[in-house]
Structures are given as structure tokens and as C-alpha cells.
């Protein structure tokens, strides 16, 4: 290709030279004196234009070929990303053919409940619920494997959609993507910096992870509606280490304090004391780490991520007690900002309201809204979902219908929760089982 262009270029040069000589000769003989000379000049110009046109065509072909040569490289990079996202995962059951999944961290109760550890009646009650505990453990093992994958694969420059799909497809793969029997417990949250919770990318999202971002990775796994709710914070710059250390310590404090008959306010008070004992220095300015007082942990019901009880991360005088057999998500949020969040930004998280009155459902008149509700019931039930999950089911032009379901009270929306812009927030969370004889931090792993 290069040699052909060079030959044409030489021809163009030759024609130019010939044309120049011809013009010079004509000028020496006087203008328009010889029609013969004028014809020669016109012929040379025609040759020049043809040669130039040919050269331009060959240059265009050369450029097109270069682009074609580059395409495989671009496609190869895109393919690598797609393969990473669409990687096949063997169902977790293939690794545990006997159906028994590993326990989490088992902790004896203390003080007045110490007797539970050896009490035969309590041990018998625990055995009766072994199938339930085992389903939580299955979800926890999936969570541990997926978050290890996430920590290994997530890098600055990845889009939020790439990260979310990497995590969610891995959960679906390990779960066997079994609809309401197993899979995502709620959408993958990837809240950045001053955004503390409830951000997951929608289909049109162009946001990209940067080196200096602080990202809360919060995702759930469920097995027959038994939900593992666990979260960690991912950073690349070690200047945030003290912030992460504060929140991790606060979460572990909440886990230690939790137990049967423990008052919720006492847990919040212990968490607050630990969190506020930390400081973090960022770009020469020192901040006390503040608990985000209007965020909290919660108990978990079957197919219900929020079961009705809230575990505060500050003292709040709620004397409600934890009870035997309950499951709790112990989570804490620390901030360099004001320690208070508000709902702001484009919503991605939704869930059918399990307490919606019957007349709210019967009041839905628009057929499209009824159809969408049927899709939600069949695929998510009362588990939280996001707009990308609806897209994935092939639904189109559903936003008006979704908003109608929200306005009717049948579906609840959960917009992103943000602290003051410019601040940084971190989160750590574990799921604990208050078994009759021991407390099990079922989602505990070697990482946190």
C-alpha cells in the first residue's frame, strides 16, 4: 500500500514540474500566441488532477486499512472486559456436594446469657433451625467469593456499570440464578465519596471510578429469601486508611455488643464512642470521624431486607431489645462531613412495599402499571431491585408506570443518600445470627 502511494506522489510531482516548465515556456513566447502550447498546458493540468485524485483515493484506502488493523485491538480490549463481566461461575453447591456450608465466626454469649452455650435445651432449638442457618451460610460463602473477586478485579478507570455487572453476574452464577429461590438480595451499591448509600448505576450512567474515590461496595445475596447483607469500603489511596479503620472498628464494636436481650440504644452508644475517637487527616486538614446519625443497621426478615427494628450508630434511647432467633445487619457509616445524609440524585433502588394496603394495589388503574407490578411480583417479590434489573427482563418504557406504583404506595423508592459535597464516607457491615446458644457472624471472612 505504501509503495503505490509513493509512485503516485512521484507522478504528481512530475506532472507539476512538467506543468511548470510548460507555463514558463508559454510566458517567454507571449500570452495566447500559440494555441498548441495552451493545449499542452491544459493536458498537463488534467493529468495532475487525475493523479491527485488517485493519490487521495489511495490515502483514504490506507487510512481505512489502518483503522481496520486497529479494530481487532479495540475489540480485544472490549472482549476482555465483557469476558470478565460475563465469566461463567459454577454454582456454589458444586463445591459443597454434601450441602453443608461453612460456619461464620461463632461467638459465645456473655454475662447473663453465658448459660446458653452449654444449655441442652438451647442446643436442641439451634439444631431444629439448622436448615435456616445453613441457607444463610450458603449465601455468606457466595458473598465472600464475590467480594474477593471484586477486590481483585476492580481498578480505577472502570465504569460503575462494569463494576456492578461484574459483582451481580458473579452472584447470579454462584447462586445458579434461581429467581426467588436464590440470587441478588438487593442491588449492588457503589456509592462514592460523599454519597453514603443507595447509589447503583442506571443504564445511561457514564460515571467512572477514579483513583482518589472512596467507594462503598454493598451487595446482598439471598437463598430462599434469607439475605446476607454485608459491605466494605474500597480505596486506592492510603490517605483514607484512618477513616476506614474507624468505621471497621465501630462495626466490630457493634457486633461485639449485640446479643439476645441487648438494648438497641446501648449498641448505638458503644458504636458512637468508638467512631468519634478517631481522626483522619486529608490534604493537611484534620477531621473527627462522625457517625452518620440518621443511618443505621437493622434486623432482616425473610424476603425483607428491613425487618422493622433499627440498630442505631449513636445513642438514641431506644430500649427495644434484640431477641433469640433474629438476624441483624450490623452496619456503621463514618463521615468527614456533617454526619447527616439526605436523599438526592437520580433514583435506582426500589422495592415492593410488603405493608402496602390492599386498596392501594386495587386502586391501580393503568394497565402498564399493572403489568409492571406483575413482573416485579414474579421476579423480585419484596426483595429490592434496581432499574437495570427491569431492563434485563426486557421491559421497555416503564418509568411512568414505575412512578405510578411509587405514588400509589405499592412500591417504595430509595434515592441516593448524600452528606455534604466534598466530604468522604465509609461503611462496613456484617450479618449476624442470634442463634439460641451462640452468636454467629455469618458473613465474616479473612478480609473483614
From Swiss-Prot:
Its cofactor is Co(2+); Zn(2+); Mn(2+); Fe(2+). The keyword Flavoprotein does not apply. One of its GO terms (biological process) is proteolysis. Binds 2 divalent metal cations per subunit. Has a high-affinity and a low affinity metal-binding site. The true nature of the physiological cofactor is under debate. The enzyme is active with cobalt, zinc, manganese or divalent iron ions. Most likely, methionine aminopeptidases function as mononuclear Fe(2+)-metalloproteases under physiological conditions, and the catalytically relevant metal-binding site has been assigned to the histidine-containing high-affinity site. Disulfide bonds: none annotated. Gene3D superfamilies: Creatinase/methionine aminopeptidase superfamily (3.90.230.10), Winged helix-like DNA-binding domain superfamily/Winged helix DNA-binding domain (1.10.10.10). InterPro entries: Creatinase/aminopeptidase-like, Met_Aminopeptidase_Type2, Pept_M24, Pept_M24_MAP, Pept_M24A_MAP2, Pept_M24A_MAP2_BS, WH-like_DNA-bd_sf, WH_DNA-bd_sf. Pfam families: Peptidase_M24. GO terms for cellular component: cytoplasm. It is an enzyme of class 3 (hydrolase). Substrate binds at residues 198, 306. It catalyses: Release of N-terminal amino acids, preferentially methionine, from peptides and arylamides. It is found in: Cytoplasm. A divalent metal cation 2 binds at residues 229, 298, 331, 429. Residues 24-34 have a biased composition (Basic residues). GO terms for molecular function: initiator methionyl aminopeptidase activity; metal ion binding; metalloaminopeptidase activity. PROSITE patterns: MAP_2 (PS01202). Its EC number is 3.4.11.18. Signal peptide: none annotated. A divalent metal cation 1 binds at residues 218, 229, 429. Keywords: Aminopeptidase, Cytoplasm, Hydrolase, Metal-binding, Protease. Transmembrane segments: none annotated. HAMAP family: MetAP_2_euk. Cotranslationally removes the N-terminal methionine from nascent proteins. The N-terminal methionine is often cleaved when the second residue in the primary sequence is small and uncharged (Met-Ala-, Cys, Gly, Pro, Ser, Thr, or Val). This is Methionine aminopeptidase 2. It comes from Komagataella phaffii (strain GS115 / ATCC 20864).
Amino acid at each position: 500500500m505504501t509503495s503505490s502511494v509513493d509512485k503516485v506522489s512521484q507522478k504528481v510531482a512530475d506532472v507539476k514540474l512538467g506543468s511548470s516548465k510548460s507555463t514558463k515556456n508559454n510566458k517567454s513566447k507571449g500570452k495566447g500566441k500559440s494555441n498548441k502550447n495552451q493545449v499542452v498546458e491544459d493536458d498537463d493540468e488534467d493529468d495532475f488532477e487525475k493523479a491527485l485524485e488517485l493519490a487521495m483515493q489511495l490515502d483514504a484506502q490506507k487510512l481505512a486499512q489502518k483503522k481496520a488493523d486497529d479494530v481487532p485491538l479495540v475489540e480485544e480490549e472490549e472482549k476482555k472486559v465483557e469476558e470478565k463481566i460475563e465469566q461463567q461461575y459454577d454454582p456454589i453447591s458444586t463445591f459443597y456436594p454434601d450441602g453443608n456450608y461453612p460456619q461464620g465466626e461463632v461467638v459465645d454469649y456473655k454475662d447473663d446469657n453465658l448459660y446458653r452455650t452449654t444449655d441442652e435445651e438451647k442446643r436442641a432449638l439451634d439444631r431444629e433451625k439448622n436448615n435456616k442457618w445453613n441457607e444463610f451460610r450458603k449465601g455468606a460463602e457466595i458473598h465472600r467469593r464475590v467480594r474477593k473477586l471484586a477486590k481483585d478485579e476492580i481498578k480505577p478507570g472502570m465504569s460503575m456499570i462494569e463494576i456492578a455487572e461484574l459483582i451481580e453476574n458473579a452472584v447470579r452464577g454462584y447462586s445458579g440464578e434461581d429467581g426467588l429461590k436464590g440470587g441478588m438480595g438487593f442491588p449492588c451499591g457503589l456509592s462514592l465519596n460523599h454519597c453514603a448509600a443507595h447509589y447503583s448505576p442506571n443504564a445511561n450512567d457514564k460515571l467512572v471510578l477514579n483513583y482518589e474515590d472512596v467507594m462503598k461496595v454493598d451487595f446482598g445475596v439471598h437463598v430462599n429469601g434469607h439475605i446476607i447483607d454485608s459491605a466494605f469500603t474500597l480505596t486506592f489511596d492510603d490517605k483514607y486508611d484512618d477513616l476506614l479503620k474507624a468505621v471497621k472498628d465501630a462495626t466490630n464494636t457493634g457486633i461485639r455488643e449485640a446479643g439476645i436481650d441487648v438494648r438497641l440504644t446501648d449498641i448505638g452508644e458503644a458504636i458512637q464512642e468508638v467512631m468519634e475517637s478517631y481522626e483522619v487527616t486529608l490534604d493537611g486538614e484534620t477531621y473527627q470521624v462522625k457517625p452518620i446519625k440518621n443511618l443505621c443497621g437493622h434486623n432482616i426478615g425473610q424476603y425483607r431486607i428491613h425487618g422493622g427494628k433499627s440498630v442505631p450508630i449513636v445513642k438514641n434511647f431506644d430500649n427495644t431489645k434484640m431477641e433469640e432467633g433474629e438476624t441483624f445487619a450490623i452496619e456503621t457509616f463514618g463521615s468527614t462531613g456533617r454526619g447527616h445524609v439526605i436523599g438526592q440524585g437520580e433514583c435506582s433502588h426500589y422495592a415492593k412495599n410488603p405493608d402496602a394496603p390492599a386498596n392501594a394495589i386495587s386502586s391501580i388503574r393503568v394497565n402498564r402499571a399493572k403489568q409492571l407490578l406483575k413482573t416485579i411480583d414474579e421476579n423480585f417479590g419484596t426483595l429490592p431491585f434496581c432499574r437495570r434489573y427491569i431492563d434485563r427482563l426486557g421491559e421497555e418504557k416503564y418509568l411512568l408506570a414505575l412512578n405510578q406504583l411509587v405514588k400509589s404506595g405499592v412500591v417504595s423508592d430509595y434515592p441516593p443518600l448524600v452528606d455534604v459535597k466534598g466530604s468522604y464516607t465509609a461503611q462496613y457491615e456484617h450479618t449476624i445470627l442470634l442463634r439460641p446458644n451462640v452468636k454467629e457472624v455469618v458473613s465474616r471472612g479473612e478480609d473483614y
